[in-house]
Amino acid sequence: PLCLNTVQGYWVNLLRVRKSGVLSRHRHPAPVHGVVLRGSWHYLEHDWKATEGSYVFEPPGETHTLVVPENVPEMITMFHITGAMIYVDPYGRQTGYEDVFTKIEMCRAHYTKTGLGGDYVDQFIC
């Protein structure tokens, strides 16, 4: 993460993908903003492609499925996500979610496992 804001309920992170394929089908209750820093990707539900330098806006409530094409060795996108990521199945039924608080707990577990210590995440919380 770059920022985990518990007061306003958002997080900013760099999504790095080094393998092609479908990442997830999800939606958000609030707007999401992104900037593609490397590589490219697209949503199954749209005909546009997000390429290096592209600004991406995801409107609230829209379900989309992020896909990284086979010819892309690495994709990095900076996302600013407010509210939550709500994971859904092909029928739109919720299968899980992430918000700033679950992100913090995921980071604590990861940093503990890697030897940095769970409190390493505290520097990103604002």
What are these language model-derived features?
Residues H26-H28, H64:
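Histidine-centered active-site/metal-ligand motif
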Residues P1-S24:
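A short glycine-rich, His/Asp/Glu-containing loop-to-beta-strand
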Residues L14-R16, S40, H80:
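Residue-level recognition of well-ordered beta-strand positions that form the cores
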Residues T6, W41-T65:
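Short acidic-glycine-tyrosine-enriched beta hairpin
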Residues R18-S20, H28-E45, T51:
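Glycine- and acidic-residue-biased ligand/ion/polar-headgroup-sensing regions
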Residues T51, P60-P90:
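Ligand-binding loop in jelly-roll beta-barrel domains
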Residues I86-C126:
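Acidic/histidine-enriched, glycine/proline-rich intrinsically disordered or flexible terminal extensions
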Residues P1, V12-L14, H33, Y55-F57, ...:
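Conserved hydrophobic/aromatic beta-strand scaffold that supports enzyme active sites
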